[in-house]
């Protein structure tokens, strides 16, 4: 998995590429823990367009980030759109 972070005055965009699974889930959580304090005055976007797979742990990590931030999820492929809907719907049912 590759994580790219782009920061601007009002936003932080986290771009994820590859598999959000296995040993990469703790890395996503670590990066999130570092960036979360900076969100007080910024909005978060998570670009999942190039995510090819997310296991249960990866989906859970993304759900937790979404639950804390209501981040804008960027998805333009059927898989990414499915993943985005799954993340948002599960949060809304909770």
Give the positions of each predicted feature.
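Amphipathic alpha-helical interaction surfaces in cytosolic regulatory modules
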Residues: 16-93
């Amino acid at each position: 998995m590759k994580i790219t972070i782009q920061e601007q005055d009002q936003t932080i965009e986290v771009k994820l590429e590859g598999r959000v699974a296995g040993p990469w889930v703790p890395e996503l959580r670590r990066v999130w823990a570092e960036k979360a304090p900076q969100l007080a005055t910024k909005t978060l976007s998570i670009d999942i367009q190039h995510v090819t797979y997310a296991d249960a742990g990866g989906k859970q990590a993304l759900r937790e980030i979404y639950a804390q931030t209501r981040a804008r999820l960027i998805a333009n492929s059927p898989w990414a759109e499915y993943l985005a809907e799954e993340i948002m719907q599960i949060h809304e049912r909770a």
